Amino acid sequence: TLLNASKATNFNFKIEGTSLSDEDIAKINSLNPTRNKVIERYKAITKKGCKLIFDKVDNSTFRNNLIMLDGDLPSIIANLLLEQLNSGVSTLKELVEQITETNPLGYDTEQASPFYAYKIKHLLTSAALGMMPATAWSGKFDANGGYLVVKKDGEILCYHFYDRNRFEDYLFSNAYLERSSTSRHEYASIIKENDGTLSFKLNFQVRLK
């Protein structure tokens, strides 16, 4: 696991559009199919004429770690999480390709610069080499000479830091988003805040194939 699910990796979205009654909220929160529970709850929200608008990364430490890597990373990850719900795709490379097409952050794409892929590769590498969501990060890597990857079949891959591009490409090609349990971390439930606004949390958990 590159990034484990925890409250620190919650991304908070505001539900905007048609107002939802307490009955609507209870009904959506009670949706509990054996598969695709989060997608079904998301679809129920959108069917009511609502949409999710990214609000913030809940944990200030993780938020600061992401901003230190790149100020746009919180918004990029939020768009990846929404794209996963809309498309059903979970591999990070495919999700990045899809948001590169839609370009939600409005980057200048005239020269086909790989903005989204570059930033996500930087995040994956940093997570692999020491950056943890709930710990303030200095920007220094834990490993000095290289990195060993033990695959599920027992094969061991060795990447030296002078070959960082290959290491980044390996992570990028093999990383996928995994949904954590909806019974933990206030994940994928509609929450009525004290100010009356409605929140819906998505969790950012990254594993390797």
Language-model segments: what does each one mean?
Residues 1-209:
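Short, positively charged
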